Swiss-Prot record:
One of its GO terms (cellular component) is respiratory chain complex IV. It comes from Saccharomyces cerevisiae (strain ATCC 204508 / S288c) (Baker's yeast). GO terms for molecular function: cytochrome-c oxidase activity; endonuclease activity; heme binding. This is Intron-encoded DNA endonuclease aI3. It comes from the Eukaryota.
Length: 415
């Protein structure tokens, strides 16, 4: 019972202890106040027999108890985190983490979340050699388009980790996991399913958690339900063996429809799948800039779909003061445009569904792929060209129709 309360890391348990201290201190302070009032109310009858020192002790003790052991623990201890949270997030809307009775399918959730985090997520871990006085815990943040708020809430509810922040006047939302339990849970879920150089950040996060758990006897007792994370190697299994590519595509992939009106050849509607990632993952370590290449994972994806891997170079104008400063970005790109190879893309994403709003684009995209595969390119009524034109009216960036029925009973949940 003693260990239950003294070693608890639950915020509600800690708040209850603060309230208990405040109540006990309030009772003691009230008793002192009563003695002081009796002493002052009867000048001719000295209850303390003229002991001025004892009277002064009671006055000072009453003030200390009521201010530092009643008011501060009750208000700051019991409500401090809530007040600070509200004041620091005036520009954010925090979405409720509703409690759903969902069971996780780790074999599918792990790869999907790994792909999602390796695409649009970050795992931030302070360097152990940092000279900063303030040490902070690992932080996991996943960025979603504003249209994918439903997915962010779904994953937050499913894993019971973190909170979803909707930024005011921004076109994105953030799923942020900062508490120890949440970070520990998510690192365990994606352990063994990472495929890109971001694995390096995962390892640092897992090592931080292991070192923190074993740092002191008190910490170890507090976190006795948390075992050390047994760090697994990079996942080198076949791309089609799990949902990793679905998570990565929800982050950085897209399904496009091009309408090609050529002069020397007939007009065509061209559906294609594209995934583009930067070429290198950079990490500053002891003033040494270490590069890790994305070539191997992108080559594996290209091989899976039997297409070529392309290298792309782009110059971005940084607009520094009045001078045009350019920064060159290098990326690898996988593009599947062949009709028969698009069928394999369909087979994969029918098995491991996308969960973002891109799922709706994929369904429309699939209609065009199936029509072209069955009937070929056609400018006729109800042909591929007409279908492509109609689909593009509510598609990708122009989409205004969103449904989320595909988030009910997903393959990420046990069945």
């Amino acid at each position: 019972m003693v260990q239950r309360w003294l070693y608890s890391t639950n915020a509600k348990d800690i708040a209850v202890l603060y309230f208990m201290l405040a109540i006990f201190s309030g009772m003691a302070g009230t008793a002192m106040s009563l003695i002081i009032r009796l002493e002052l109310a009867a000048p001719g009858s000295q209850y303390l027999h003229g002991n001025s020192q004892l009277f002064n002790v009671l006055v000072v003790g009453h003030a200390v108890l009521m201010i530092f052991f009643l008011v501060m623990p009750a208000l700051i201890g019991g409500f401090g985190n809530q007040k600070r949270y509200e004041s620091n997030n005036n520009n954010n809307q925090v979405m409720e983490n509703k409690e759903y009775n969902l069971k996780l399918n780790y074999d599918k959730l792990g790869p999907y979340l790994a792909g999602l985090i390796e695409g649009d997520g970050t795992i931030t871990v302070q360097n152990s050699s940092s000279m900063k006085k303030s040490k902070y815990r690992p932080l996991i943040v996943v960025v979603f388009k504003l249209e994918d708020l439903e997915l962010a809430n779904y994953l937050c509810n499913l894993t019971k980790c973190g909170k979803v922040y909707k930024k005011i006047n921004r076109n994105y939302v953030l799923w942020t996991i900062h508490d120890l339990k949440g970070v520990y849970t998510l690192l365990n879920i994606i352990n063994g399913y990472m495929r890109t150089p971001k694995y390096e950040a995962f390892v640092r996060g897992a090592e931080f958690m292991n070192n923190y758990i074993n740092s002191t006897t008190i910490t170890h007792n507090k976190l006795k339900n948390m075992d050390n994370i047994k760090i697994k190697p990079l996942d080198t299994s076949d791309i089609g063996s799990n949902a990793w590519l679905a998570g990565m595509t929800d982050a950085d992939g897209n399904f496009s429809i091009n309408l090609m009106n050529g002069k020397n050849r007939s007009s065509r509607a061209m559906p294609y799948y594209c995934l583009e990632l930067r070429q290198n993952y950079q990490k500053n370590s002891n003033n040494n800039n270490i590069n890790f290449s994305y070539f191997y994972i992108m080559s594996a994806i290209a091989t899976y779909f039997n297409v070529n891997l392309y290298s792309r170079e782009r110059n971005l104008n940084l607009l520094v003061s009045t001078n045009n400063t350019y920064k060159t970005y290098y990326s690898y790109k996988v593009m599947v445009a062949n009709t028969y190879k698009n069928i394999k893309v369909m087979e994969y994403f029918n098995k491991y569904s996308l969960l973002s709003s891109k799922h709706l684009d994929f369904l429309d995209w699939s209609k065009l792929v199936i029509l072209i595969n069955n009937e070929g390119q056609s400018m006729k009524t109800n042909g591929s060209w007409e279908l492509g034109m109609n689909l593009r009216k509510d598609y990708n960036k122009t989409r205004t129709t969103f449904t989320w029925s595909h988030l009910k009973n997903t393959y990420l949940e046990n069945k």
